[in-house]
Structures are given as C-alpha cells and as structure tokens.
Amino acid sequence: MFSVVLGAAVAFFVTVTLGSSFIRFLQTRKFGQYVREEGPETHLIKAGTPTMGGVLMLMGLVAGLAVVARPNPATFSVLLIVAATAGVGLYDDWQKVSKRHSEGLSARYKFLLLSLVVVLADVMALRYVGVTQNVIVPGFSNNLVLGPGVVGVGLFSVLMLFVIVGTTNAVNLTDGLDGLAAGAGGIALLTYTAIAFLERQYDLAIICGAMVGAIIGFLWYNSHPAEIFMGDTGSLAIGGVLSAAAILTKTEMLLPVIGGLFVIVALSVMIQVVVFKLTRRRVFKMAPIHHHFEMLGWAENKVVVRFWIVQSAFSALGFLMYYFFLYSSV
C-alpha cells in the first residue's frame, strides 16, 4: 500500500511541477487546439489552448513508477499497451497540429493502428503474463471458457479488440469539456487500483495509482478554464491503462460498469448517428451527450461535476459487484 501511495504522490508532484514549463513549451511551438466550428459556440474561445497534455501525464506516470515499480512481465506489458495507445494518440494530435485542423487521423486508420495494439496486447497477455482465455461473468459460478487452441485465442483476441478499442475511443469521446475525461478516468482508475490490490496484483495497483496521481496533477491545469488539453495522447493513454487493468484482473465484463460514464457518452454518439441517418432527426441537441446539456444551458463546470458524480456512482457499483460476486467467492 505504501508503494501505491508513494508512486501516486510522486506522479502528482512531478506533473504539477513540470506543468507550467510544459505549457510554455507548447505555446512557444504553437501546439494549440483547433476547435470544431460545429461545436458549441462557447468553445470557440478555447481555440489555441495547448494540447498534447497527455505527454505531461505520462511524464508524471513514468516518474512515479521509476521510484516504486518493479521490473517484471506484468509491468512491462501494461506500459507497452499504454505507450502504444498513447503513441497512436500522439500521432493523431500531431496530425491536427501540423495540418492546423481539428480533424486528425481518419476513424478507419485509427482503428487499424489500435488493432495493432491489440495484437501486441494479445501476445503479452497470453505468452508473457499468463492471462487465461476464460471470461469471468459476475453472478455465475463457472467461468466462460472461450475455447481450446486457436479458437480460444481467436475469441480472446476479439474480446481484447472490443475492450481496448472500445475503451480508448469512449474515453476519447468523453474528452470534450475541461476536466471531464481526466476526472472520470481518475475515478475509474482509482477503482481499479483497489481491485488490483485486492487481487494481490501489486505491480498493477502501483501503475493504476501512479496514473491517478498523474491525472490529479494534470487536473491542476486542466480544470476550467483549462490551460492545457490532454489531447488524444492523454485520452488514449487513460483508455489503455483501463483496458490493461480490466484484462489483467479478469474483470472485462465489469469494465462497462466501472467506466459507466464512458459507455453513456459513446452510446449517445452512436444513437445520434443511427437515428439521424434513419429519420433525419436528432435525439440530442448535440452529441456527445455532455454537449447536449451545455446546449440546455448548463454551465460547463456544472456538467463536469455532475458527470463526475455519475461516474463515481458507476465505479462504486462496479466495485461492489466485484467485491460480492468475484472477490468474496474466491
């Protein structure tokens, strides 16, 4: 427990300490955010705010882990997944900055790159970490075995595709208001810190805890009005840690509950697109759903805090489901 707290504290301290200098560095090189014209009008004043803040979070994470983490396959596996997802996000951010446009990588190309991350995660999980090809469903006494040999590996790979690509994209969609994705991600990762600790996966608990510390440090600058945005670098990194934590703790089926807010945000976009294509009408004033509430007149801070409360409720429910259906049954 001491190592978890120490890692989080170091990550927080380093992120806060380096924040101002990193923001000035981004401003000097004009690495600013380009805001979509079709977005809320209140967001137009955010144009030019430094982006790629996920790099700052990762510096805090690395610093925290350098102090307390132990080198082993589990640690390296999680860090490789995080580095790979963050790398895709960084490339996307760079495309936006270099092209001076709010659109980065195409959805198809980003999916392809994240699919390659899944292949990497698949190899690390099955070959080096020893993750089994079974799925634990809360409330059921028997595990769901995906199948023997090649069939099992194939089905497990499909599951990992849904977990990693789905989670990273859902967190990315949530990153639309100052502090929203960071705060919600921190809450979900705090839950996984506790789960990993109870599972005696202490190295994973240290990584999740350090990421929470880095996120809190990032919120020092990302809270409204934000001085820096995390960009895809940060949102995909958070999604990467969440995905890895779910896979290693065998709580893939609980991830949609623990990260419930991200699911709601992603569903709001899918519902909006499908209904509009079928009926030419919109369910929400604007998607993702946090912009809908902005259009209703809610202040940005109010939307963010209320969504944090919703995410806290989901994470608490997910932890209780884990504790009573999975942990207590062992």
Curated annotation (Swiss-Prot):
Pathway: Cell wall biogenesis; peptidoglycan biosynthesis. It catalyses: UDP-N-acetyl-alpha-D-muramoyl-L-alanyl-gamma-D-glutamyl-meso-2,6-diaminopimeloyl-D-alanyl-D-alanine + di-trans,octa-cis-undecaprenyl phosphate = di-trans,octa-cis-undecaprenyl diphospho-N-acetyl-alpha-D-muramoyl-L-alanyl-D-glutamyl-meso-2,6-diaminopimeloyl-D-alanyl-D-alanine + UMP. It is found in: Cell membrane. Keywords: Cell cycle, Cell division, Cell membrane, Cell shape, Cell wall biogenesis/degradation, Magnesium, Membrane, Metal-binding, Peptidoglycan synthesis, Transferase, Transmembrane, Transmembrane helix. Its EC number is 2.7.8.13. One of its GO terms (molecular function) is phospho-N-acetylmuramoyl-pentapeptide-transferase activity. The keyword Cell wall biogenesis/degradation applies. InterPro entries: Glycosyl_transferase_4, PNAcMuramoyl-5peptid_Trfase, PNAcMuramoyl-5peptid_Trfase_CS. One of its GO terms (cellular component) is plasma membrane. One of its GO terms (biological process) is regulation of cell shape. HAMAP family: MraY. NCBIfam families: mraY. Belongs to the glycosyltransferase 4 family. MraY subfamily. This is Phospho-N-acetylmuramoyl-pentapeptide-transferase.
